[in-house]
Amino acid sequence: GLLDTIKGVAKTVAASMLDKLKCKISGC
């Protein structure tokens, strides 16, 4: 459903943001 799609997108965005933060903090 739509809610599941939104949840999936939110998880993907959160994961990519966390990866970027990790790169800034400790390098890629």
From Swiss-Prot:
Disulfide bonds join C23-C28. The keyword Lipid metabolism does not apply. It is found in: Secreted. One of its GO terms (biological process) is defense response to fungus. One of its GO terms (cellular component) is extracellular region. It comes from the Eukaryota. Expressed by the skin glands. Keywords: Amphibian defense peptide, Antibiotic, Antimicrobial, Disulfide bond, Fungicide, Secreted. Signal peptide: none annotated. Pfam families: Antimicrobial_2 (PF08023). Antibacterial activity against Gram-positive bacterium S.aureus and Gram-negative bacterium E.coli. Has activity against C.albicans. Belongs to the frog skin active peptide (FSAP) family. Ranatuerin subfamily. This is Ranatuerin-2B. It comes from Lithobates berlandieri.
